[in-house]
Amino acid sequence: MIDCIEFAEQAYTYRDRHIPYKELDCQAFVEKVLHDCGVSRNWRGSNHIWREALKWRGTYTEALVKYGCIPRGALLFTVKTDGGEKKRGYNDKDGNACHVGIFTGEGYGAMHSTTGGVQQARGDDRRWTHVGLLKDVDYHTDGLTDREMLEKILDYVKIISEVLKK
């Protein structure tokens, strides 16, 4: 399993390499960074990654609520409800994940490949609608996040307060 920091830092090394899109599209870029970290994958596109490669996925806001931030090395997706997934053989209601990038950390943004080639973008760019955590990457989220721990403590305080009132 790859450490999320290693994965994010490896993605960031591509910022000045000027690799054209015809060499690496967005899905191939994610695969290349994984390969550089020792993991080989052969996905059919960003829709395949969205459906098969993630241990967690949700909207950008859901990720912020669950983790308190976007974890370094998380995949950022543009997911549309335009039916484009059907052309790619997916007949579910999971949307059309038409673009993917790698979040490299606060202040560093995201690395992705577009028609302009591999480039850096803001991590909070409106293009990114969803976040996914790869099964192959350790995001250090196995334990409770600070937010989840606080919610549990507050739940216990409510229970104890009710018991003490009786």
What does each model-found stretch correspond to?
Residues 1-44, 71, 79-99, 138:
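N-terminal capping segments
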Residues 8-16, 54, 158, 165:
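Generic secondary-structure transition motif, activating predominantly at the C-termini of alpha-helices
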